[in-house]
Amino acid sequence: VGFKAGVKDYRLTYYTPGYKTKDTDILAAFRMTPQPGVPAEEAGAAVAAESSTGTWTTVWTDGXTSLDRYKGRCYDIEPVAGEENQYIAYVAYPLDLFEEGSVTNLFTSIVGNVFGFKALRALRLEDLRIPPAYSKTFIGPPHGIQVERDKLNKYGRPLLGCTIKPKLGLSAKNYGRAVYEYLRGGLDFTKDDENVNSQPFMRWRDRFLFVAEALFKSQAETGEIKGHYLNATAGTCEEMLKRAVFARELGAPIVMHDYLTGGFTANTSLAYYCRDNGLLLHIHRAMHAVIDRQRNHGIHFRVLAKALRMSGGDHIHAGTVVGKLEGEREVTLGFVDLLRDDYIEKDRSRGIYFTQDWVSMPGVHPVASGGIHVWHMPALTEIFGDDSVLQFGGGTLGHPWGNAPGAVANRVALEACVQARNEGRDLAREGNEVXREACK
């Protein structure tokens, strides 16, 4: 008695426009494109239902729990300006739906199933509001921006990096030689490419040994602390941690992980190891464009960036901004702030749908990488500020005099731009002149 089987509209249960969100709710903003004939309210309610407690029909066991306590709620829907049949659906999820400290569970719940739903032509997760009650259950960055600067004894400027090229094919000894040339030229870091793991031409243990030799030799010559992002990504978590242990035993200061291909569970495991053992953790976002490139379907990178800050990483690649449209610049700087700052106000012009309070969670260094060179230095210095890593691959190796002179050119340009900025010069207007003066 009281149970009535059958299919009913999702909006009768999961669309609640009068709902007042709680401080402990996880809030999501979805860009949805309903199928023709599907009302926006039904589509939004379907998203809330299928990513929380709902299924396609009423079930007897609904009566054995409190749906009001556990269900997701679509509490607001707004049309997207300038787009036909696109809406932003706001969904609130009770905190008890999620396992503490697990990005894996968070993503499995919110985006694990609903993206293939028939009522929707397309769906994109634009933003998440993570309440402090949930974010405090995560490890966060193993060390964060300030501790990294203290470890490196480097302040008042962006850090400089370089990816070793060719990314595949070098022997371990030649690879180590390239690392040494860059670091002695003035870079702070060099980097394994994301797809350098342990291939037949260069096994990981050989690479780690020759890179460690290059690190210590360049440190002795320059008097500066140097690092190389030793990619610990592997086919199993056990093998990944074995590589991280070997890096620590060699005295390396930093390791690297491909967090999307490696997975959030592996990434969080590595972050715990890095915090416990004093290793910095560099994160590459390989595979991100598969997820975030389409404007109306997938997951925006700002969500992946927030997830990484919770899962754990001290650096993450975040695009370059340089040469892009102004609107994209603002959106990129929006998620750069979400990586670095403690408190970020809602600002739709920057793509930030919710105010995010990270409380005391350490910040992550954004890494500008990809197609940049020394003449971009003034713009990069102005846009990203000091708390960033500027990574020049071809922009270092492509120097006509070789690797070390390429590194010298980048370091000289960076220090000239920082000094000019500190003297009050306008880098946006005078940047090229600053770099030319530094060439003399």
From Swiss-Prot:
<feature type="binding site" description="in homodimeric partner">
    <location>
        <position position="113"/>
    </location>
    <ligand>
        <name>substrate</name>
    </ligand>
</feature>
<keyword id="KW-0479">Metal-binding</keyword>
<feature type="binding site">
    <location>
        <position position="167"/>
    </location>
    <ligand>
        <name>substrate</name>
    </ligand>
</feature>
<feature type="binding site">
    <location>
        <position position="369"/>
    </location>
    <ligand>
        <name>substrate</name>
    </ligand>
</feature>
<feature type="binding site" description="via carbamate group">
    <location>
        <position position="191"/>
    </location>
    <ligand>
        <name>Mg(2+)</name>
    </ligand>
</feature>
<comment type="subunit">
    <text>Heterohexadecamer of 8 large chains and 8 small chains; disulfide-linked. The disulfide link is formed within the large subunit homodimers.</text>
</comment>
<comment type="similarity">
    <text>Belongs to the RuBisCO large chain family. Type I subfamily.</text>
</comment>
<dbReference type="InterPro" id="IPR036422">
    <property type="entry name" value="RuBisCO_lsu_N_sf"/>
</dbReference>
<dbReference type="GO" id="GO:0016984">
    <property type="term" value="F:ribulose-bisphosphate carboxylase activity"/>
</dbReference>
<keyword id="KW-0488">Methylation</keyword>
<keyword id="KW-0120">Carbon dioxide fixation</keyword>
<feature type="active site" description="Proton acceptor">
    <location>
        <position position="165"/>
    </location>
</feature>
<feature type="binding site">
    <location>
        <position position="193"/>
    </location>
    <ligand>
        <name>Mg(2+)</name>
    </ligand>
</feature>
<keyword id="KW-0150">Chloroplast</keyword>
<dbReference type="InterPro" id="IPR020888">
    <property type="entry name" value="RuBisCO_lsuI"/>
</dbReference>
<keyword id="KW-0460">Magnesium</keyword>
<keyword id="KW-0934">Plastid</keyword>
<dbReference type="GO" id="GO:0000287">
    <property type="term" value="F:magnesium ion binding"/>
</dbReference>
<feature type="binding site">
    <location>
        <position position="163"/>
    </location>
    <ligand>
        <name>substrate</name>
    </ligand>
</feature>
<keyword id="KW-0560">Oxidoreductase</keyword>
<dbReference type="GO" id="GO:0009853">
    <property type="term" value="P:photorespiration"/>
</dbReference>
<dbReference type="Pfam" id="PF00016">
    <property type="entry name" value="RuBisCO_large"/>
</dbReference>
<keyword id="KW-0456">Lyase</keyword>
<dbReference type="GO" id="GO:0004497">
    <property type="term" value="F:monooxygenase activity"/>
</dbReference>
<dbReference type="InterPro" id="IPR033966">
    <property type="entry name" value="RuBisCO"/>
</dbReference>
<dbReference type="InterPro" id="IPR020878">
    <property type="entry name" value="RuBisCo_large_chain_AS"/>
</dbReference>
<keyword id="KW-1015">Disulfide bond</keyword>
<dbReference type="InterPro" id="IPR036376">
    <property type="entry name" value="RuBisCO_lsu_C_sf"/>
</dbReference>
<keyword id="KW-0503">Monooxygenase</keyword>
<dbReference type="GO" id="GO:0009507">
    <property type="term" value="C:chloroplast"/>
</dbReference>
<feature type="binding site">
    <location>
        <position position="194"/>
    </location>
    <ligand>
        <name>Mg(2+)</name>
    </ligand>
</feature>
<feature type="modified residue" description="N6-carboxylysine">
    <location>
        <position position="191"/>
    </location>
</feature>
<dbReference type="GO" id="GO:0019253">
    <property type="term" value="P:reductive pentose-phosphate cycle"/>
</dbReference>
<keyword id="KW-0602">Photosynthesis</keyword>
<keyword id="KW-0113">Calvin cycle</keyword>
<dbReference type="InterPro" id="IPR000685">
    <property type="entry name" value="RuBisCO_lsu_C"/>
</dbReference>
<comment type="function">
    <text>RuBisCO catalyzes two reactions: the carboxylation of D-ribulose 1,5-bisphosphate, the primary event in carbon dioxide fixation, as well as the oxidative fragmentation of the pentose substrate in the photorespiration process. Both reactions occur simultaneously and in competition at the same active site.</text>
</comment>
<keyword id="KW-0601">Photorespiration</keyword>
<feature type="binding site">
    <location>
        <position position="285"/>
    </location>
    <ligand>
        <name>substrate</name>
    </ligand>
</feature>
<dbReference type="InterPro" id="IPR017443">
    <property type="entry name" value="RuBisCO_lsu_fd_N"/>
</dbReference>
<feature type="site" description="Transition state stabilizer">
    <location>
        <position position="324"/>
    </location>
</feature>
<dbReference type="Pfam" id="PF02788">
    <property type="entry name" value="RuBisCO_large_N"/>
</dbReference>
